[in-house]
């Protein structure tokens, strides 16, 4: 079992790094965990739609280069399916039962994910209709993956 969190951009703030580190440690009891960061594309403040697409395409190429062919790709998207914590655990368990053991959760940059990445996705997951900073989403995601493993194992975890 391997969980990869693949994200555009680097974590800069110490408090986000500490939170991620804590959940990496907790999650390692259940799965191999890897966090891969790809560089975000430098972009001016006010971009045209064409420039935004170019940025998304370049970031998308970097993301796709890190995904193995056999990986189950779960993209975080505003338009994705919203699940409860139990629902995420059930979805992961269902996929594991089918023999899927290499999960890659993909978090896009500030402009979102390119169509090429969305096409590679096996499952579109949404945490909210709201937009969150990608640094925060990494922490929320890794905590929810950890919680999913606790639920799958029937272990107690605070609510």
UniProtKB/Swiss-Prot annotation:
It is found in: Cytoplasm. S-adenosyl-L-methionine binds at residues 76, 108, 127-132. Signal peptide: none annotated. One of its GO terms (molecular function) is rRNA (pseudouridine-N3-)-methyltransferase activity. It holds the Pfam family SPOUT_MTase. It is an enzyme of class 2 (transferase). The keyword Kinase does not apply. The keyword Zinc-finger does not apply. Its EC number is 2.1.1.177. Belongs to the RNA methyltransferase RlmH family. Specifically methylates the pseudouridine at position 1915 (m3Psi1915) in 23S rRNA. HAMAP family: 23SrRNA_methyltr_H (MF_00658). This is Ribosomal RNA large subunit methyltransferase H. The lineage of its organism: Bacteria, Bacillati, Bacillota, Bacilli, Bacillales.
